């Protein structure tokens, strides 16, 4: 795909460094990245850091770190450079001021001296009369005398862009043809009274100067598109822009209660998913399904498969609901796709202090390597590894009291005694032999394997649910396992 003029694809990802990155931001970055890579185009990473009150260097560093962790690369931007540097808006103020002045000089913009109180009064009157409540164009055609009077009153004007008195129609890459009537798109501010340029100016100016061909962004910015198209036409006339980019607006991501997922929702924080041990490839797989799909019958795929198939015209316009359980399930599938060696290494952060509850010297690498393939079949997120293998490295199992109560019913002492005898005589190099031993103990007490192994599992691991029992027994070792059964029998007898 190329732009309307046939130039190569150039897309941008332009977050603000405010707070922790959130999953909606990641979904937008993913779709732009995949679109650029699918078309062998260029991804521009631009930082919109013009809000001094909210932006921070810490958030900026988190953004870069998050992009790296997710595996995104960019062709122009921070740490990479490029022909349109600088790529931080805070370093481009002279550019915006120059463009604003050109718009004023050409009559595409004008100074507005209305106070907030005056704006509010006229807005309420318009609402009461059933008319559009946007800016009414009061300062559009001020005389020199009016300007002089306002200036003498000490009023500091903002700069507004002059919207054309005509409908604006464009074809959204996701939603199809959309038309905005002029009465619904009033003149809007582009420069504050203190001279600071607003997002409404800097974002399209940067897109124009960086020759962006396709703008893929959230649905919340759809209503700003007619204003930007009108501004683009003015920028083309001034020689600042070459063409109007194509726009595609991605569907809302909905959270619990069918409400739009906000960056303030804990569920939306990217850091939360990193801390829980989501794989980048698992999280990205799930986020890609929020508005897009590879095929009707395939939910699990690699990032390479997504790039090969991604077409923004396949993105659905309807809101997509974030389903945490499905996200976890897909991540679990990606955990099972890892090579075992890769899995063992990715689990490392959860196998050492301060996360791991065992002493560093009690961690046994050989036991970890032996149990890892079995653990890999069970996890949804990597952080679950700690509770699944703690029985191997702690001196005693940590008993979950609910599990103890559930498993240690009347007759459990007799079953455990028989199971201990059978296990003591079994071959501990064979999980199948250990299974036969517990099966035989169960048969001696009229129990099937599922009922027979529950007390053994709790005695050895502390829980009723966990990794495959007989492989766990083999890795733990005969001496420790039998000692734990003895301890459980003593507790039952107390």
From Swiss-Prot:
Keywords: Aminoacyl-tRNA synthetase, ATP-binding, Cytoplasm, Ligase, Metal-binding, Nucleotide-binding, Protein biosynthesis, Zinc. GO terms for biological process: glutamyl-tRNA aminoacylation. It comes from the Bacteria. Its cofactor is Zn(2+). Its main location: cytoplasm. Zn(2+) binds at residues 112, 114, 139, 141. GO terms for molecular function: ATP binding; glutamate-tRNA ligase activity; tRNA binding; zinc ion binding. Its EC number is 6.1.1.17. Binds 1 zinc ion per subunit. PANTHER family: GLUTAMATE--TRNA LIGASE (PTHR43311), GLUTAMATE--TRNA LIGASE, MITOCHONDRIAL-RELATED (PTHR43311:SF2). Monomer. This is Glutamate--tRNA ligase. It comes from Streptomyces coelicolor (strain ATCC BAA-471 / A3(2) / M145).
């Amino acid at each position: 795909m190329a732009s309307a003029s046939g130039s190569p694809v150039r897309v941008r990802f332009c977050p603000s460094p405010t707070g922790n990155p959130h999953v909606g931001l990641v979904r937008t970055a993913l779709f732009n990245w995949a679109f650029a890579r699918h078309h062998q185009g260029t991804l521009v990473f631009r930082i919109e850091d013009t809000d001094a009150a909210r932006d921070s260097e810490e958030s900026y560093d988190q953004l870069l770190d998050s992009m790296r962790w997710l595996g995104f690369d960019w062709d122009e931007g921070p740490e990479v450079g490029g022909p349109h540097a600088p790529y931080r808006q805070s370093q481009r103020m002279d550019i915006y001021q120059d463009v604003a002045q050109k718009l004023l000089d050409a009559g595409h913009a004008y100074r507005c001296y209305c106070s907030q109180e005056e704006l509010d009064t006229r807005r309420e009157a318009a609402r009461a009369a059933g008319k559009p409540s946007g800016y009414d164009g009061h300062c559009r055609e001020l005389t020199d005398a009016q300007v002089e009077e306002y200036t003498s009153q000490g009023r500091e004007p903002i700069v507004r862009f002059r919207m054309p008195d005509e409908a604006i129609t464009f074809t959204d890459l996701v939603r199809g043809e959309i038309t905005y009537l002029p009465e619904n798109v009033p003149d809007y501010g582009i420069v504050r009274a203190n001279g600071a340029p607003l997002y409404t100016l800097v974002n399209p100016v940067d897109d124009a100067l960086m020759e962006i061909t396709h703008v893929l962004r959230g649905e919340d910015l759809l209503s700003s598109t007619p204003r930007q198209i009108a501004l683009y036409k003015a920028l083309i006339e001034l020689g600042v822009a070459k063409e109007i980019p194509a726009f595609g607006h991605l569907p809302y991501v909905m959270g619990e209660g069918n409400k739009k997922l906000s960056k303030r929702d804990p569920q939306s924080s990217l850091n939360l998913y990193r801390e829980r041990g989501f794989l980048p490839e698992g999280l990205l797989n799930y986020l890609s399904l929020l508005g897009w799909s590879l095929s009707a019958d395939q939910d699990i795929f690699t990032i390479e498969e997504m790039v090969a198939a991604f077409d923004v015209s396949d993105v659905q316009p309807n809101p997509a609901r974030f389903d945490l359980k499905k996200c976890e399930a897909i991540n679990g599938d990606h955990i099972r796709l890892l090579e075992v060696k890769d899995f063992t290494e990715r689990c490392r952060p959860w196998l050492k202090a301060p996360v791991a509850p065992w002493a560093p010297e009690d961690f046994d690498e050989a036991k970890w390597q032996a149990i890892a393939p079995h653990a890999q079949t069970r996890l949804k997120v990597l952080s679950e590894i700690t509770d699944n293998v703690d029985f191997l490295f702690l001196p005693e199992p940590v008993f979950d009291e609910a599990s103890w109560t559930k498993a240690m019913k009347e007759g459990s002492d007799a079953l455990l005694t028989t199971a201990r005898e059978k296990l003591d005589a079994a071959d501990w190099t064979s999980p199948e032999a250990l299974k036969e031993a517990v099966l035989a103990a169960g048969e001696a007490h009229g129990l099937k394997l599922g009922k027979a192994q529950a007390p053994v599992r709790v005695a050895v691991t502390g829980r009723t649910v966990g990794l495959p029992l007989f492989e766990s027994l083999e890795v733990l070792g005969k001496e420790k396992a039998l000692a734990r059964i003895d301890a459980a029998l003593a507790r039952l007898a107390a």
